[in-house]
């Protein structure tokens, strides 16, 4: 006899919702294996809890820009002690909490609805810091005003929209060398783990050091000396151990025993432990900041209307000179690599990549929603919106369709009214979650071609630079430049030596060409050119039709092999004892464990 969850999953799968989102059992010719309604809901909740910290963290960072608040104190140009200015900042922070939750809700819901991908969007970490501390400056001390910076973000979004509409972003992701695409997933996993170890968004196990880039932390923040934990105080912070044992070890054990919702359980348990005040692990210490946070937490249900950040764009571009253009270009190249790399890695993590075309279903809509969300977010007063690597938390819980992202969007919508609760999830509650997700993502390192240095070195540079520069974009840039330089030099040497000087193991290299299957033009343009009236709908002649993902992977492997040796066939597998063995993908391996 079927239990209630199976009955619900089967009923939804047979409905129009099941066919729309291609749930398992829906009868859709491209239904996604393992995609079940209740699993998608749980995955969406997991993604939300993993990235709920962005509500308070993004608001805190953007408040440091000063927003539209005006500082007129000549003696104190940053107005740190100006009462009126700081009161304005308090209003600004509440505005940013509402704005962050609102744009995250809208963008994540639309991403799931239109692209059917389990990828959530929100104002990006790193981009918000660049926006605040480099472009606008602390309390408006930078070269560009808050309004002009928002204008740069607004324009950037529409440039992205054009690039997405005409297929350039999709082509960039598909034309990227395979070793770089695989390494980006590993690098993002390491990047997530590093975030999970920090104080700002993790358990606080590491800090910076005077002599080394990072060192062991774990002390109470008040005991730090110049941002470094003294020797005797390291690993003495009670919140660190609550995060490790309740948010990490317990979650791992639950996952080992296949307990559904293990990640959510860990986050909720640590949060509940951290809310009471008279404890050593409280998130609300008896300080000015703690009192203010606790007063906000006690409201539980409230709605704060945005008062100061709506539509603050300034269009007098001459006042900033070249600084406006510099900010726009920087936002463009950082965001295009960051978001494109993240989306591709998340699509691979959930098993949605077609190995034949190196694209994923709904990519055009995914990139378009991302682009429009950037411009809409700027109208709310926010820094650029981007795909969140924390989406991997939901994917690791089994999320495979847009229902996951839509659930996350609904949670962000609810959080607008319950912002005191969701803004009070401590970073040590989600830190171990990020580390666990990172550990799942680095498994694709086994698929990187380590035998040929022309592929291995660029891949390693990419995955190493990402966490240590705290930037996905910089890692991709470093990896791509290294790949181009090494392989160009190899080609030059071969030409000059008439093919006599060939690097070791070159026959094992991954094939690459800029002529990707399907060409540069997006699917909707090709369908329109064929005279298809409903050109926005995919059909059997699309690059993702016909063979499907599984056959596509095999076709891609054979196409890459050419007429050469057996080892060249091995695009997505390893050779053991003369036989080619195809490893499980990350999503397949998780399904097996679940």
Model-derived features with residue positions:
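Transmembrane helix-loop junctions in multipass membrane proteins, especially transporters and channels
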Residues: 63, 67, 116-120, 168-169, ...
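Helix-loop-helix junctions within the multi-pass membrane cores of secondary transporters/permeases
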Residues: 9, 13-54, 76, 83, ...
